[in-house]
Regions:
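Ferredoxin-type iron-sulfur electron-transfer modules in oxidoreductases and energy-metabolism complexes
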Residues: 6-27, 45-144
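Basic (Lys/Arg-enriched) interaction patch that binds polyanionic ligands
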Residues: 27-47
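Internal, non-catalytic "lid/hinge" segments that mediate substrate recognition, gating
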Residues: 1-5
Length: 144
């Protein structure tokens, strides 16, 4: 059971996306992806071509679990990469779980189980990240 109570925000203003709060995770996160692999709601995947040794002209394309937190996940042709910094990846993952998913389906993706908190070798608490976002949302709302 997760000892940290997760307070999910209601509406998330777009200013949270550019907040400097994400810089902390550029320094702390090592991009191992453990948080994604234990998360019951993470669904990132990549495609992998497997060729059979019997006949190199025959094979299959497999869907393989992946992690938006690891190096190489956002690589594109021509040597580009969308999210090089770990803080940018953390922002993407967080906002996907509490903003994008909610906007599409009407509820948050994070269930607050705390598995990600338990496995992080850098002791980054995703539960606390969500609570920080909630506090930042309240701060922005109070300014307006």
């Amino acid at each position: 059971e997760n000892e940290t109570r997760v307070n999910l925000p209601g509406e998330v203003p777009l200013s949270i996306f550019t907040s400097d709060m994400w810089d902390e995770y550029t320094a702390r996160c090592i991009g191992c992806g453990r948080c994604n692999y234990v998360c019951p709601t993470c669904t990132c995947y990549t495609m992998q071509d497997v060729y059979y040794t019997d006949n190199g002209k025959v094979g299959e394309r497999r869907r393989v679990n992946a992690s938006c937190m690891v190096d190489g996940y956002t690589n594109v042709a021509g040597g580009g990469e969308y999210r090089k910094k770990h803080g940018d990846r953390m922002r993407f993952k967080t906002m996907h779980k509490i903003y994008d998913f909610r906007k599409r389906f009407g509820y948050n993706m994070c269930v607050g189980c705390g598995r990600c908190d338990t496995v992080c070798p850098e002791y980054i608490s995703f539960s606390n990240i969500i609570n920080k976002v909630t506090a930042k949302v309240e701060e922005v709302q109070n300014e307006n």
